[in-house]
């Protein structure tokens, strides 16, 4: 009789086995194939799967799908395709074999199969037990648009350069510019426009930036990779004939003009793309602008000022001033033009009164080199002079007054004022930009165009610091292993000496035993002779024999004792040899690790030295400056063709933009965009607003093979080339997969990494390992050679929600639903400490920069640095992220507000919705 173990699933009653009758089986006449997906799977789900699934597989039999069924159970195969009568699944379901399925009085209340169901099961097996479930699975599942009420922030990521923060609200991804706090809009998958226009159809469970600024987002069964787009070239205008020097724009941004070194002016009409060229000057143009009535105003180095209408080419008003003109600005609502002259005087002319001079402003002690107006009605302007000062002027009724003087420390070559009248900026032909507060004349920021390279230098400096720490730790470990090696060598020497001594002692005792045996034999012979002869000395012979026997027994015991000691000495020597071998191996490993650490440090130090040399050598030259239309940013053009930007509130660096042109000669804001005129004679309007495009998708909504369920966690490798994802089927599996970012192909995987879903994942700092946190209460580490388990850490008493590596790679930290943070020694595989303080689950964990301080966030409405709460978390925090350098923390939660703190002062910097 065949037997299959279902004992834990069966209420075995002997009388049932003896007396129970087989279940009735219907007679069916069906020519078409029985469908597993349609006819059999629902039956198993109703009556069998409660006890036979991936989580609870009684007798190791899983009936969830055909492929796992075919693997059989503890006892072997359970389905024989083509022969139902030999298939235990059918026999036990039909109660034709003991161990009925489902068992009588089962706890799941699973019913017996009906006659028709048994008939279909039998026919399906006889037809070959074919699997059409994959076909059924391919049927498209329709997803409805997610409600806008689902807007909690479940995922947050900070870009490696601190410029951007991504926040996953519900199924939408919002991007923010960290320095300015401006919203950059949403990331949208165009294929989902019919579902509300979102990034994912399901909650965005994970976000991560790589070292190149690529953003990865995880949703249901898919990962999406978003790449920051190049600046948008809005208008590639007709080039000028000679090198451009200045540019201007009308108040409505419909017209813009460029003046060149030959005296020509081109006016571009945005709507029609028409270009009109004027040649009203014979020397280099030093200023262009638009006055009331559409007048085009221009000045040239030879002191001429011109005013004309676009459509009236013949009507040109000109006037020559008494000093060469270096700069011009339209002021006073477009009714006047201010001219900065070589003699240090600013001359103000009336545009409507045929360029009649109405004011002469004195104050500068050297030539005026730059002018910039501000305010909606252009009632104010700023002047910059070779005397190294900036002066702020206010236009009143019939007069112009100087209201502020600012010492710029060096002569500016270009200045700009913000439209809101709060800031002015200057560049002086070097890498510096100065941003000033116009209300009090105080310096807001002293920026440097080399900030990005300096930031890279700092990053490499941090790496050198970490590698120095690793090198020092490896030195310490080598010292300890050398000490252990020496101790084990000494122990072996002692063990060998003891063994040698015990061998010598044993040989001695064995010789004594031989002598004792000889004496005992002689005593026995003597005793026997005296007994036979009835010798009167028989008594003394007996005593002598007794003593000889006792001496022999004593020597035998001594030999046994020495043999035992010799065996112990041999074992001690063998143990010492094993310990010494381990010590030799450990010492060799320590030496290799130290050599690797020293080599890594040497290479990193060289890279740092090279970058430092570049910082010292590369002198950026900023030549022109302008503010954005909203006054939030200031842009500076340089000799290297790049456009550099800073936010204006505190002067934090924003971006370095490759305008793909030569040396920048003039820049000006055109609405929300920037006009760039370059030495290569190009005139282009750019939209520098950062945007991201969907670059690649991994997996799909209908594809459960690539990614089985939600992607709860993502982590890029240090070089940004690999992406690790963590997920799985809740209560069933933990899915760890590693992807090649370039082509989206799978590199390695471990789909049985955990017994429950992975909730946190992190690449080690050297990229050789991946740490995972899962709801099965384990923290695990897998190597990159096939995602093989390297370490397993047990200690959390509830779901583990996140995991992070310390920068040196020696220690990991994890946070869990048990409200604690734990630190683990990776190489020793042991727990270092448990940190308490949170009163709800710890949702995110990270180390701050290259240090040892921990950042933790929790549902208890707190984000903490070293267990000290930051101000105003004030909501259930689902996710937090710390910048690579540890200077800012971003967090979001149930109230949908993105909060950003600066770690240096623990202050809330931004609250964004």
Task: For each feature predicted by the language model, list its residue ranges.
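WD40-repeat beta-propeller superdomains and closely related acidic/aromatic-rich repeat-like regions
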Residues: 131-913
